[in-house]
UniProtKB/Swiss-Prot annotation:
Sample GO molecular function, one term: metal ion binding
EC top class, as a word: lyase
Record lineage: Bacteria, Pseudomonadati, Pseudomonadota, Gammaproteobacteria, Enterobacterales
Gene Ontology biological process terms from the UniProt entry: isopentenyl diphosphate biosynthetic process, methylerythritol 4-phosphate pathway; terpenoid biosynthetic process
Protein name, per record: 2-C-methyl-D-erythritol 2,4-cyclodiphosphate synthase
UniProt record similarity statement: Belongs to the IspF family.
Record text on subunit structure and interactions: Homotrimer.
Taxonomic source organism: Pectobacterium carotovorum subsp. carotovorum (strain PC1)
Residues bound to a divalent metal cation: 8, 10, 42
Binding positions (4-CDP-2-C-methyl-D-erythritol 2-phosphate): 8-10, 34-35, 56-58, 61-65, 100-106, 132-135, 139, 142
Details of cofactor binding: Binds 1 divalent metal cation per subunit.
Length: 165
């Protein structure tokens, strides 16, 4: 078993859509980023890459490469997951925490879980997404941006490490 941790943060700004966990969320602003700024998918990608010892999202998809300008983060996650699968890993489980004062994430979490399970070719029971605030403290509490943390457990395929419930 291998554990990876991912973290991402983006500042609000611009007129682009707000995309979190692959879901377009109605809001007054998007997030400033080279790609679509999806903090959930970026943190998840980093957690998975870290667990597989494949570096990080910036190494795989550098923001200096124009090919990734405005990139759909679901596509980036799928490509990272393909490489992780090639190393013989499958997902044990994934736990995601979104840190945002606004907008409220609860109505969108079920679809985020669906998107992650689809992209990672796993069951929804293997994916947890939750959200919290910082009680109006810090940059997220002031509504300046959104942060996300993710923890992923990978297991080698065929090792019997996965428990079937």
């Amino acid at each position: 078993m291998r554990i990876g941790h991912g973290f991402d943060v983006h500042k609000f700004g611009g007129e682009g859509p707000l995309v979190i966990g692959g879901v377009r969320i109605p809001y007054t602003q998007g997030l400033l980023a080279h790609s679509d700024g999806d903090v959930v998918l970026h943190a998840v990608t980093d957690a998975l890459l870290g667990a597989a010892a494949l570096g990080d999202i910036g190494k795989l998809f550098p923001d200096t490469d124009p090919a990734f300008k405005g990139a759909d983060s679901r596509g980036l996650l799928r490509e990272a997951w393909r490489r992780i699968n090639e190393k013989g890993y499958q997902l044990g489980n994934l736990d995601v925490t979104i840190i945002a004062q606004a907008p409220k994430m609860a109505p969108h979490i079920p679809q985020m879980r669906v998107n992650l399970a689809e992209d990672l070719l796993c069951h929804m029971d293997d994916v947890n997404v939750k959200a919290t605030t910082t009680e109006q403290l810090g940059f997220t509490g002031r509504g300046e941006g959104i942060a996300c943390e993710a923890v992923a457990l990978l297991v080698k395929k065929g090792t019997g490490e996965i428990v079937a419930w």
